[in-house]
Amino acid sequence: MPKMKSHRGASKRFKRTASGKLKRSHAYTSHLFANKSTKAKRKLRKGAIVSAGDFKRIRNMIAK
């Protein structure tokens, strides 16, 4: 059986932290910034941690 390939799209979107968690970026950051407050835009710049419900599925997608 051939080796499993990692999901290339997921590999580009998620990074593993030193403690083993998965880091992601926020959505709603590509355009339409005039409708968003400065506070909302500032919060969107920060990264976020993948939730526990999605962790296992995404971990399997990016496993090499």
From Swiss-Prot:
Q: Name one GO cellular component term.
A: cytosolic large ribosomal subunit
* Gene Ontology molecular function, alphabetical: structural constituent of ribosome
Compositionally skewed regions (Basic residues) per UniProt: 1-26
Instruction: Supply one GO BP term.
Output: translation
Q: Per the record, which residues fall in region Disordered? A: 1-42
Enumerate the UniProt keywords alphabetically: Ribonucleoprotein, Ribosomal protein
The yes or no answer to whether the keyword Ligase is present is no
Q: Which PROSITE patterns match?
A: RIBOSOMAL_L35
Protein name, per record: Large ribosomal subunit protein bL35
